[in-house]
């Protein structure tokens, strides 16, 4: 890797992401079959937990010299279109220029897909780069103006004088990797209102589309240090665990910004709904909600550009007070107030499998059109998650303008209750302090989920954390923008499909043992004869009794052979215990194996109300008083008799053939005496001993 001066802010705390990135860098992907033109692969699995795990990973891998010791051969025709995504897409190398590029990355349904640009022959390496829309979104602008300005064929960085032979590594270096550019973005002052790249045009948020698009493309190539502010590329931790936008505090916060691709792509999705605004206009008029206050001009934060802001400081307090002090102040607010709602809200709502054929999707450049053709089943539950937020944000913006002061109140950042499921916190306001109490991780899902239907709309819904207490919180804590009812969603009704911009699920170590047992019960198929110890399945459980109770709960919940599947049992009952792991006598085990081989047994679950607790001292002794029907063991024979009368007296008679076969099997091998029940034979065998 040639860029050794990458800021440590990217690497700190991201060891796993870095390891994944290194694995991706040193692996190339070759296809084992021919790929036709316009073939679609994806979605690419991204958790968006770091810069390396976002849509920027393609640019971060781009280098002039490739060192690829590992070759990954993929049958690209197999398993295409699965909802889980294709893991090998992360391993595809970045193209260095347009000549060698054969795959194009684009966003559909908020997820990252690859599309073949031409016919790719067998045993050819797959090389990907961003499509036109993502190139504009990430400000990976073409280098034509650079060539005109310099007149030299190699690409040279004007800041660090590093030379590149290929175009794509050069623009990736400018956008993400140049250490001097990143450093100057940190230390540069917040003035330079007049200089730089079209600050007033961008700040207005509604100027000429062509001029803005031209300035947007030329911005990263400006020779001055002004455009260096466009590159806050360090992945700094947020000031608050509830904040998705680190630079949310108004009036002098020194928090460093981070590139929030989540809000960028959400805004891109939002802008598709309006047929009157071009991509450049929609991006430049408020798409910078992801990192207010000197965030990148790439993200076109109107306040950061109009004020030339460096670190969340507001040059004009009256504008900060009017807009709420957060990201997307003037342009974003103006756009949502003045622009009419789109006629069709059904944007970005097709599944990856639904439209696989070539030509069945719409490009982002097709002004204001849907990403996919509307399907007949596209209904209320499948629409975008950000449609309701516009009305709520519009009402809340009129409310907030009278109450916010110049010191700064956090802007509701139009994705409140939607995209990240989080609010933009304020550092110096009681209103912001109330917003900080909103539980971000499980967070308020969009109002589309209130009906309990599976949300298959926008990909920007938060993935609920397992066992999160805040997963069903109301929309009141999501910020002022969601106060109109866009917040309260159920965590249980969330989409199963992974989003490229979703928050990651919480790890199992944060769950209580019983909750963990319930979550893993359906995942681990268990059978009484497996002999799998509960301590192996649940190593995190602290006390041994909890392990036994847990194992029993999951045994009853996971065994497919039980008729009711454990549905009628409270899984946290203290009288449920894992009898499958208790030791049995050898004769009883042999008889059990013989009976199991005879045919399917009709098992019946005991009722949790009358099941008697066992004595745990019997764990060290052979269990003699055990029920052959439900595998429960008892210390006293009277307890077993009571159990048999209360539980299995009304059991339906089995088929005659199976019954006769079972009676033949339950025969004493010493005296040839037959028994109807297995525990009778077991008790009889002890008399021979």
Curated annotation (Swiss-Prot):
Residue ranges with Gly residues bias: 193-210, 322-333, 472-491
SUPFAM superfamilies cross-referenced by the UniProt entry: beta-beta-alpha zinc fingers
SMART domains, A to Z: ZnF_C2H2
Cellular component aspect of the GO annotation: nuclear body; nucleoplasm; nucleus
Ranges where the SET domain occurs: 16-131
Tissue spec: Expressed in brain, heart, skeletal muscle, testes, prostate.
First-listed, main subcellular location of the protein, grouped into a coarse class: nucleus
Entry EC no(s): 2.1.1.-
Signal peptide (from-to): none
Zinc finger (C2H2-type): 155-183, 625-648, 666-688
GO biological process: corpus callosum morphogenesis; corticospinal tract morphogenesis; methylation; oligodendrocyte development; regulation of DNA-templated transcription
Gene3D superfamilies, sorted: Classic Zinc Finger, SET domain
Keywords from the named record: Disease variant, DNA-binding, Epilepsy, Metal-binding, Methyltransferase, Neurodegeneration, Neurogenesis, Nucleus, Repeat, S-adenosyl-L-methionine, Transcription, Transcription regulation, Transferase, Zinc, Zinc-finger
CDD domains: PR-SET_PRDM8 (cd19192)
Enzyme's top EC category: transferase
Ranges annotated as biased composition (Low complexity): 241-258, 273-286, 423-433
GO molecular function terms attached to this record: chromatin binding; DNA binding; histone H3K9 methyltransferase activity; transcription corepressor activity; zinc ion binding
Binding site residues for S-adenosyl-L-methionine: 130
Subcellular location(s) per record: Nucleus
Family to which this protein belongs: Belongs to the class V-like SAM-binding methyltransferase superfamily.
Known role: Probable histone methyltransferase, preferentially acting on 'Lys-9' of histone H3. Involved in the control of steroidogenesis through transcriptional repression of steroidogenesis marker genes such as CYP17A1 and LHCGR. Forms with BHLHE22 a transcriptional repressor complex controlling genes involved in neural development and neuronal differentiation. In the retina, it is required for rod bipolar and type 2 OFF-cone bipolar cell survival.
Subunit structure: Interacts with EPM2A and NHLRC1. This interaction sequesters EPM2A and NHLRC1 to the nucleus. Interacts with BHLHE22.
Disease involvement: Epilepsy, progressive myoclonic 10: A form of progressive myoclonic epilepsy, a clinically and genetically heterogeneous group of disorders defined by the combination of action and reflex myoclonus, other types of epileptic seizures, and progressive neurodegeneration and neurocognitive impairment. EPM10 is an autosomal recessive form characterized by progressive dysarthria, myoclonus, ataxia, cognitive decline, psychosis, dementia and spasticity, with onset in childhood. There is variability between patients.
Protein name from the UniProt record: PR domain zinc finger protein 8
The organism of origin for this protein: Homo sapiens (Human)
């Amino acid at each position: 890797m040639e860029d050794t001066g990458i800021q440590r802010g990217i690497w700190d705390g991201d060891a796993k992401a870095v390891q994944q990135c290194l694995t991706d860098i040193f692996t190339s992907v070759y296809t084992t079959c021919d790929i036709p033109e316009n073939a679609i692969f994806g979605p690419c699995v991204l958790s968006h937990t770091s810069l390396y795990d976002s849509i920027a990973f393609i640019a971060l891998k781009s280098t002039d010299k490739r060192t690829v010791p590992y070759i990954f051969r993929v049958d690209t025709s197999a398993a295409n279109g699965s909802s889980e995504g294709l893991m090998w897409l992360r391993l595809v190398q970045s193209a260095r220029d347009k000549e060698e590029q054969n795959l194009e990355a684009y966003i559909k349904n908020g997820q990252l897909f690859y599309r073949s640009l031409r016919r790719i022959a067998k045993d050819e390496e797959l090389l990907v780069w961003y499509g036109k829309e993502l190139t504009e979104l990430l400000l990976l602008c073409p280098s034509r103006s650079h060539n005109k300005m310099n007149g030299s064929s190699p690409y040279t960085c004007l800041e660090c004088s590093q030379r590149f032979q290929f175009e794509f590594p050069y623009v990736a270096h400018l956008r993400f990797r140049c250490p001097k550019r990143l450093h100057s973005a940190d230390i540069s002052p917040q003035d330079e209102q007049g200089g730089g790249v079209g600050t007033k045009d961008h700040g207005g948020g509604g100027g000429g589309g062509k001029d803005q698009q031209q300035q947007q493309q030329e911005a990263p190539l400006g020779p001055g240090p002004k455009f260096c502010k466009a590159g806050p590329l360090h992945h700094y931790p947020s000031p608050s665990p509830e904040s998705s936008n680190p630079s949310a505090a108004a009036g002098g916060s020194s928090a460093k910004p981070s590139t929030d691709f989540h809000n960028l792509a959400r805004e891109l999705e939002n802008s598709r709904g309006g047929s009157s605004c071009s991509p450049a206009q929609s991006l430049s008029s408020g798409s910078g909600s992801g990192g207010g206050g000197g965030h990148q001009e790439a993200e076109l934060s109107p306040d950061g550009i109009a004020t030339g802001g460096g670190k969340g400081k507001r040059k004009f307090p009256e504008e900060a007070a009017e807009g709420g002090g957060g990201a997307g102040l003037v342009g974003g607010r103006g756009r949502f107030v003045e622009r009419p709602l789109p006629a069709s809200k059904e944007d970005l709502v097709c599944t990856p499998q639904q439209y696989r054929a070539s030509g069945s999707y719409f490009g982002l450049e097709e002004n204001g059109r849907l990403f996919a053709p509307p399907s007949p089943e596209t209904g209320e539950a499948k629409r975008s998650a950000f449609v309701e937020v516009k009305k709520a944000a519009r009402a809340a913006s009129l409310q907030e303008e009278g109450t916010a002061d110049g010191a700064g109140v956090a802007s509701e950042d139009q994705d409140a209750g939607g995209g990240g499921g989080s609010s933009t916190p304020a550092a110096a306001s009681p209103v912001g302090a109330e917003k900080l109490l909103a539980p971000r991780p499980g967070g308020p899902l969009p109002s589309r989920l209130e009906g309990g239907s599976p949300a298959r709309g926008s990909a920007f819904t938060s993935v609920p954390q397992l066992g999160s207490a805040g997963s069903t919180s109301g929309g009141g804590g999501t910020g002022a923008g969601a106060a109109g009812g866009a917040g309260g969603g159920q965590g249980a009704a969330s989409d199963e499909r992974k989003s490229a911009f979703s928050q990651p699920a919480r790890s199992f170590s944060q769950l209580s043992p019983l909750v963990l047992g319930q979550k893993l019960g359906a995942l681990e198929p268990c059978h009484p004869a497996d002999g799998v110890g509960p301590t192996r399945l649940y190593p995190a459980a602290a006390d041994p009794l909890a392990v036994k109770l847990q194992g029993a709960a999951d045994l009853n919940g996971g065994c497919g052979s039980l008729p009711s599947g454990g549905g009628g049992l409270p899984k946290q009952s203290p009288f449920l215990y894992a009898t499958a792991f208790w030791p049995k006598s050898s004769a009883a085990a042999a008889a059990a194996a013989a009976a199991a081989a005879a045919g399917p047994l009709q098992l019946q679950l005991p009722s949790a109300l009358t099941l008697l607790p066992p004595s745990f001292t019997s764990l060290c002794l052979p269990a003699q008083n055990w029920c052959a029907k439900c595998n429960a063991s008892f210390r006293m024979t009277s307890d077993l008799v009571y159990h048999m009368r209360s539980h299995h007296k009304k059991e339906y008679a089995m088929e005659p053939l199976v019954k006769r076969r079972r009676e033949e099997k339950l025969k004493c091998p010493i005296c040839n005496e037959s028994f109807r029940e297995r525990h009778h034979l077991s008790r009889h065998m002890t008399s021979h001993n």
